[in-house]
Amino acid sequence: AHDKMPRFDRGVFLAPMVRSGALPCRLLALEYGADLVWGPEVVDRAIMGTERRVHPSTGLVEFIKDGKQVFSCHPIERPYLIYQVGSSTPENAAEAVRIVTAHDDVAGVDLNCGCPKPFSTLGGMGANLLTMPDLLCEILKAMRRAAPPHVSVTCKIRLLPTQAQTLDLVERIVRTRTIRALTIHCRTKPMRPREPALLDRFRDVAAHVAKVAQGKGQEETRV
């Protein structure tokens, strides 16, 4: 069993994406020196009701439902693997966390609050959570309660239209005392990858996270 949380204060990470980060990609990233790797976003209801199977010769772990693989991982990546959850309800998010942590398959769980794609936002997930901070924070609290103590909880957000709105949201998230790290995609919800990221806004957000975290005795919270 593993008893140490992953470290977010330094290193090279395979960042959380929505439809990228499957097992082959993660293993390749680790081979090239990644310190932590995020899996693809898996909607909470997709992992619920799955059967966990372990391949006897390779050790491959698969979560299967209706004859299809929903998620796969391997013990070799366990200390570095962050499982990414798509959710819009605390109850379902907690159940998803319990399922993927029941056999100590992952080092951390991450709530996606940044995906702007319709498949995510139509269900109230992803970037839609940015405008529902109460719900977002309740989901994080539920995930923290459901996760074993040594499994980290993190989340990913996008920038809100104004810096003041972004700083307020970040402060509310940090004050939940649930997260070890916050990933910030430096684009707003309507922006697409071809548009330059708003990197000039990152410094103030990072400084605000550090200030709030220190005030709450959470010096370990990273951005």
Task: Annotate each predicted stretch with a short phrase.
Residues A1-V223:
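Flavin-dependent oxidoreductase catalytic cores
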